[in-house]
Amino acid sequence: MSNKNYDAIKAHYAGSDARDLAAMMAPITNGTAWTEMAGFPYAGTYVGPDAVIDGVFKRIGEDWDGYTFTLEKLVDGGATIVGIGTYSGIYRKTGKKMSARVVHVWEMQDGSALSFEQFTDTRLVAAAMG
């Protein structure tokens, strides 16, 4: 039996791989609370798709070359979906490469994201920026 929450997040990551922002934002609603970890350069909670795009994705695009999230495992917990993988990229201002393990925790309802929370090694990201 298919889980539409799992399928929605699987499609989000497929959109990320294809650099398709619309596909990435499909499960994000006006009420989705998207939290970037404290210590991360874009730390904070952004509510709704416009805030996520402006506060996170546009800034990543401006600051990094080749920034990617490589999904290695997607865990179907029903209403909780967990993506495990690696961030990588080159910080434009320093030319330094970064690779950091990351976990994304999604709380879902009927294929829509209620919340997203990121956990990553912010020190590795900061080292590339400094």
Regions found by a protein language model. Give the residues of each.
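A solvent-exposed, acidic/Ser-Thr-rich amphipathic alpha-helical stretch
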Residues: 23, 27-79
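Short, electropositive, low-hydrophobicity segments enriched in small/polar residues
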Residues: 19, 23, 52, 89, ...
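Short, mixed-charge, low-aromatic patches
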Residues: 7-17, 41-44, 60-64, 84-86
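Hydrophobic pocket/interface hotspot
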Residues: 9-12, 24-25, 32, 48, ...
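Pocket-edge positions in alpha/beta enzyme catalytic cores
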Residues: 1, 44-45, 117
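A beta-strand edge to alpha-helix "cap/lid" segment located at domain peripheries
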Residues: 4, 57-130
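Short, low-complexity N-terminal intrinsically disordered segments enriched in polar/charged residues
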Residues: 1-30, 127-130
